[in-house]
Amino acid sequence: MPASAPPRRPRPPPPSLSLLLVLLGLGGRRLRAEPGDGAQTWARFSRPPAPEAAGLFQGTFPDGFLWAVGSAAYQTEGGWQQHGKGASIWDTFTHHPLAPPGDSRNASLPLGAPSPLQPATGDVASDSYNNVFRDTEALRELGVTHYRFSISWARVLPNGSAGVPNREGLRYYRRLLERLRELGVQPVVTLYHWDLPQRLQDAYGGWANRALADHFRDYAELCFRHFGGQVKYWITIDNPYVVAWHGYATGRLAPGIRGSPRLGYLVAHNLLLAHAKVWHLYNTSFRPTQGGQVSIALSSHWINPRRMTDHSIKECQKSLDFVLGWFAKPVFIDGDYPESMKNNLSSILPDFTESEKKFIKGTADFFALCFGPTLSFQLLDPHMKFRQLESPNLRQLLSWIDLEFNHPQIFIVENGWFVSGTTKRDDAKYMYYLKKFIMETLKAIKLDGVDVIGYTAWSLMDGFEWHRGYSIRRGLFYVDFLSQDKMLLPKSSALFYQKLIEKNGFPPLPENQPLEGTFPCDFAWGVVDNYIQVDTTLSQFTDLNVYLWDVHHSKRLIKVDGVVTKKRKSYCVDFAAIQPQIALLQEMHVTHFRFSLDWALILPLGNQSQVNHTILQYYRCMASELVRVNITPVVALWQPMAPNQGLPRLLARQGAWENPYTALAFAEYARLCFQELGHHVKLWITMNEPYTRNMTYSAGHNLLKAHALAWHVYNEKFRHAQNGKISIALQADWIEPACPFSQKDKEVAERVLEFDIGWLAEPIFGSGDYPWVMRDWLNQRNNFLLPYFTEDEKKLIQGTFDFLALSHYTTILVDSEKEDPIKYNDYLEVQEMTDITWLNSPSQVAVVPWGLRKVLNWLKFKYGDLPMYIISNGIDDGLHAEDDQLRVYYMQNYINEALKAHILDGINLCGYFAYSFNDRTAPRFGLYRYAADQFEPKASMKHYRKIIDSNGFPGPETLERFCPEEFTVCTECSFFHTRKSLLAFIAFLFFASIISLSLIFYYSKKGRRSYK
């Protein structure tokens, strides 16, 4: 026999002192909550959470937590005329030739759905009526503890009223319950899930007639008598809001009556009385022997205020009152409707008598909650939002219910999402919504102290989706509706849910734990400024003319004609903008500083016919001043930027990188930079982050040749004298399969990586040619635009690197299923998406630290054990945010993943560069805030400095490493460094000469005085 319903668990206390302080600051949580207390919820969640609390929450659910999956009779059973079943209102509604307003049952029908020439119906649906073993095997595969299903009223009582029941119908449900007992899965049984027998609709007008409550009681008694010994959780009515409002007011759902709002409220009134009758029946006649629990399944949306004002919060409270409170307050509080409804709907809202209030009050043994797209985002009337904003936030709804209805035990009896009807087994969107909702449930339990006892994923299998027909899918198991056997094939969401149940939540994983340790002594700690502040205004007076001041008359300076002073030599200290930047870098304690040159400023015409020597001098001074304070400059020759992609205007007009001549011009420009700056610069980047996603194949072809030419210029003409290193910096965001269980998604991810990174990396770091994945994919689609390299060009390009430099910012999920046309790439046949549980920046860039480690390992696997630099890594924050905790969290975790890659994976990692230096040149990305012509360090700068000073993340067991202080070589000082002994001897002679001369001078004066 199934175990009895678990006893009520002690209410878990809120776990943290900070949460208690929040509650006390809001007036405290009373021992007994009252209607209206839920309004505190918006204030509690008004401030954004700390980054570590906003993202992935690690933890497990309480012991004995109920893991369930659900289905509804009309959606899945089929067999609409089999074995004496009577017609239901949904049979009639779907067979009706005229669909009500807003109906989309035949929209975008998937392959395998009923013909669009016929109305979509549940006549066959998933055919569960003939497949008990198939369905229960799916339950066994999932590993759930509970299965929620509904009984078809018309299948057990074809006429709807008490009388001779349909034995075949009873046998079907007994067989299902027996099979559940064999598997150790407990049933959660819904008596009414929208499918009223048509006979009762015809005879009484459906739920608009109060007499239907007695028929419902009789039907429930039949079910309790036949099945109650095996059922410990009963749901009387599913989603009475939808039944009343959309069945009898809007007519969007069966029975399709387009009545007045008054009729909708009358139906809801009768539904509440019917529910109460059934609860009292069970409580009096069956609970003593069967020991089960009974409730009503209530659906709700969640709503956020447009502004955090008292008025907006009251409107949000009213919105929930009009949907959830409409039914929850009578059942859980006092037997009557919310005050906001009575005040606004006094003329059309029915009244309960005092005896009816007592009869309805307390008729639920737990709070059965439904939360998902059917109500929250599809069937919620706009006027019930009260001009506020919907949000799929389950955690906040759970907290509101906890406060509003006196801390009930909550059983989430329906929750999930949907995917397109054309989506088959890789239902990534559904899977990530499932993950989000379950994680929010865990947060509600662990962080907010809400007593949630169980969770039900909806639904077990694809089926008929009410007003959406077969245009969407909500099942964990895929059903081909055209097949004869109607096999259930597990989707990615099913595999995810099975793993989650097995782990009982999200236990901390070893790979997600921070690593203690330090980087090598010579590790490069840098910061990036792609658009360096170039200000060539000299700090000294540079006018060579001579002026007289007309003191007596005009009070102005008067130029003296024909008189000029001698031109003074310029010095680096003349550039006023350099020293403040150097001082900030010193304050940060970085060892390296990366900046980009502006090709268009240095060579306005694109060639050396016109060279801006002032700009070159500025860059030379910047580099030399960095070296002087022991900061190594890392210089990029070209950075794609507006305007003209960072190219001289003439080259941009001549086709930019589409023109092969640009590659030759770049090589000459590089030669000039090496010649002018190379004595100070020992790390060069030819091109920084050429963005492949908006670049043509011919442009990429020429860009690769330009890089190779520049590399060879340095290698052959300057390396021996300057002893520097040079490479290209590629953007390398990680691409992760959206469905980790899908081989197709893994193939898609690899394809995108090759197009995003391999396109430029493979010719340089690999074979000298483009990736075969890229070439093969394009050839299959008759796209022959990807150029070919000659053998000489391959030799020219291959191996043109001294290190591998990558810029990494985020991770992107890719899926093979087309779910969102806006984000679908038809060219690569890939759907880009994100895990909605991930932490995001204000610009919606996902924070996924482990992606950095993965891309480093992918690059090592592809191109070998090369020295690597993370040449740029950063995130945006709120405008003018001084306490940028998101960036602190980002840097802490990304750098720690870099440490894991170095220590655990053996990646030859040589340096890390944070992006970006300041907000002036990169607004919202800087480690320094810029306001009122002042630079102010943000919290992230101080945190980064701490990491630099510690050389990583040393722990108590980290071996202390002695790192001798190193100094960057000063080129101008090389003469002195190589002649230290000679210079010391000369200094000694000079010092001795000074002493001797001083003594001679002293005694000569003394001698003269003695003769006077």
Curated annotation (Swiss-Prot):
One of its GO terms (biological process) is determination of adult lifespan. N-glycosylated. InterPro entries: Glyco_hydro_1 (IPR001360), Glyco_hydro_1_N_CS (IPR033132), Glycoside_hydrolase_SF (IPR017853). Pfam families: Glyco_hydro_1. Present in cortical renal tubules (at protein level). Soluble peptide is present in serum and cerebrospinal fluid. Expressed in kidney, placenta, small intestine and prostate. Down-regulated in renal cell carcinomas, hepatocellular carcinomas, and in chronic renal failure kidney. The keyword ATP-binding does not apply. Residues 1003-1012 are cytoplasmic. Residues 34-981 are extracellular. Defects in KL may be a cause of chronic renal failure complications. This is Klotho. The gene is KL.
